[in-house]
């Protein structure tokens, strides 16, 4: 019954502004969230506005590869 390709998969979201700042070494760290997405409804990369504790504001967090 269970397929190898599940419909809901676990994804990691990473703050896009912290990634840009870490190149210049201005950021303390990089904010990451773990969530799930439905592969059939959202085949493209997931982007959500979440709170970043390093930037102290709401920023766009994008999906990264594992």
UniProtKB/Swiss-Prot annotation:
It is found in: Plastid, Chloroplast. This is Large ribosomal subunit protein bL33c. One of its GO terms (cellular component) is ribonucleoprotein complex. The keyword Membrane does not apply. GO terms for biological process: translation. Its main location: plastid. Gene3D superfamilies: Ribosomal protein L33. The keyword Methyltransferase does not apply. Belongs to the bacterial ribosomal protein bL33 family. Keywords: Chloroplast, Plastid, Ribonucleoprotein, Ribosomal protein. It holds the Pfam family Ribosomal_L33. GO terms for molecular function: structural constituent of ribosome. It comes from Populus trichocarpa. It comes from the Eukaryota.
């Amino acid at each position: 019954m269970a397929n190898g390709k599940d419909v809901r998969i676990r994804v990691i979201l990473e703050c896009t502004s912290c990634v840009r700042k870490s190149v210049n070494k201005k950021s303390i760290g990089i904010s990451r969230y773990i969530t799930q997405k439905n592969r059939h409804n959202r085949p493209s990369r997931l982007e959500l506005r979440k709170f970043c504790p390093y930037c102290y504001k709401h920023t766009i967090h994008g999906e990264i590869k594992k």
